[in-house]
Amino acid sequence: KSSAITSKTILFFYPKAMTPGCTVEVNEFQSNFNKFQKLSFTIIGCSKDSIENNIKFAEKYKLRYLLGSDLTNVCKKLGIWIEKSMYGKKYFGIDRSTFMIDSKGKLFKQWNKVKVKDHVKEVLEIAKNCP
């Protein structure tokens, strides 16, 4: 079974389900779901959370797109599993990132170190020019 993406896709990685920034991000993609759909995009969100936590997250906000759980270290392979620091404590986590894949399955645009505010609006603008 192939895991290749072969259609226009927005694949975004968020650090942790149910946290404030991630909640805003998934809901922004949800609010713009129809606009992305009109541009023929599939939306997929992904984190290192368990499948159960992502199901709860999707159900809580009635998301109309899929959330995936990175159980095979895709984050590491994409270079977005990074060392972070909070309150002086170092740990590894996801660098909030978004990947836009075109209709041929090629990377069209990549965002790293995403700031949630206005991000989805920017992604939507770029999506209008994605083949």
Describe the role of every protein-language-model region.
Residues 1-131:
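Chalcogenol-based redox active-site neighborhoods
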